[in-house]
UniProtKB/Swiss-Prot annotation:
It comes from the Eukaryota. Pfam families: Lectin_C. The lineage of its organism: Eukaryota, Metazoa, Chordata, Craniata, Vertebrata. This phospholipase A2 inhibitor binds directly phospholipase A2 in the presence or absence of calcium. This is Phospholipase A2 inhibitor clone 03/12. Gene3D superfamilies: Mannose-Binding Protein A, subunit A.
């Protein structure tokens, strides 16, 4: 919204800098006001549409987080770079419904994927006998959402986590 207001002020400044010292009838100012009001309506509609889609996705998955794959198969370091570049995160389910939403992606694709488990996680879904540091220092989820220790060099499905703070 600030960008729209600054753009409007810039246009007015350009108008005045180009030798139009006056706007006796207020046509330029009124035009800028009309444009700004139109842009505000477009912004409100876009925000409403975005939130509607986000709420629908959240409702359908039972999670405020979205887990999305690009269908690539990569190791942990490549996953980290891909998710960072996409402005997402390596999946880190904190609740059972988030883990279920993550597992749904894995089940649909029939593949395993990496996740990150925080030190203070209130929710875990380790498979029997896990964690097993001998298997590796990374963590992967299977198609049922169970967590297993894994090598960080394994090539697994790329899944990134996205969430919104509004």
């Amino acid at each position: 919204m600030r960008l729209i207001l600054l753009s409007s002020l810039l246009l007015l400044g350009i108008f005045l800098a180009n030798g139009h010292e006056e706007d006796p009838d207020g046509k330029v100012l009124n035009s800028l006001i009309d444009t700004l009001m139109h842009l505000q309506k477009l912004y409100a509609n876009l925000k409403y549409s975005f939130l509607t889609v986000h709420r629908a996705r959240s409702f359908g998955s039972g999670s405020e987080r979205m887990y999305v794959t690009n269908k690539e198969i990569k190791n942990f370091e490549a996953l980290r770079q891909i998710c960072e570049q996409a402005e997402g995160h390596i999946p880190s389910p904190q609740l059972e419904n988030q883990n279920k939403a993550f597992a749904n992606v894995l089940e649909r694709h029939g593949k395993e994927a990496y996740l990150v488990v925080g030190d203070s996680a209130n929710f875990t879904n380790w498979a029997a006998g896990e964690p097993n540091k001998a298997a590796g220092t990374c963590v992967k989820a299977d198609t049922h959402g169970s967590w297993h220790s894994a090598s960080c060099d394994d090539n697994l499905l790329v899944v990134c986590e996205f969430y919104f703070i509004l």
